[in-house]
Amino acid sequence: MLEIKVEGSRRNKKFVEAILPSIVTQLKLDTCKKALLIRLYDECNDNEGTTLDLSAVTGAYLVVIKPKRKLKEIALALAHEMVHVKQMAKGILKSAKNGDHMWAGKRYSKDTAYLSRPWEIEAFSKQELILRRAIEE
């Protein structure tokens, strides 16, 4: 079972903890044997969020999301980053040397345009539906 810890302000933490079970279920991460740390702190440079696969070292995935005033923005970023957790858990998305990534066995340079990366295309295509389902439950 996926062990989850959420860090951030009380408001943001409570919100994320409320919608996260639905997101985990939708992405079929319930049986993942790794840990997940979600940090709602301003630690992700220009991105709204970032996901790191630290499972080889710590047994965990790290999701960092910029805290926003609007909860919907946090929720969209969370849904997006959780798609990346799913991609990593299934072994479809892997980090490679020098900031490159492997997607389904194909290497993509760190210079690949953000919106041309297949893992980003998939995450953007799913985030809204995941969020809507999570809010409805």
Predicted feature descriptions by range:
Residues 113-118, 122-137:
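Long, well-structured alpha-helical subdomains associated
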Residues 27-33, 92-94, 133-137:
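Surface-exposed helix-capping loop/turn segments at secondary-structure junctions
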Residues 72, 88-121:
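Post-HEXXH active-site segment of zinc metalloproteases
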Residues 1-10, 36-47:
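Hydrophobic or amphipathic, alpha-helical segments that drive membrane association/targeting
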Residues 76-89, 123:
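Active-site recognition of the HExxH zinc-binding catalytic motif
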Residues 41-73:
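Active-site scaffold of zinc-dependent metalloenzymes
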Residues 10, 14, 72-73, 77, ...:
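Soluble non-cytosolic domains of exported or imported proteins
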Residues 11-33:
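Zn2+-dependent metallopeptidase catalytic core
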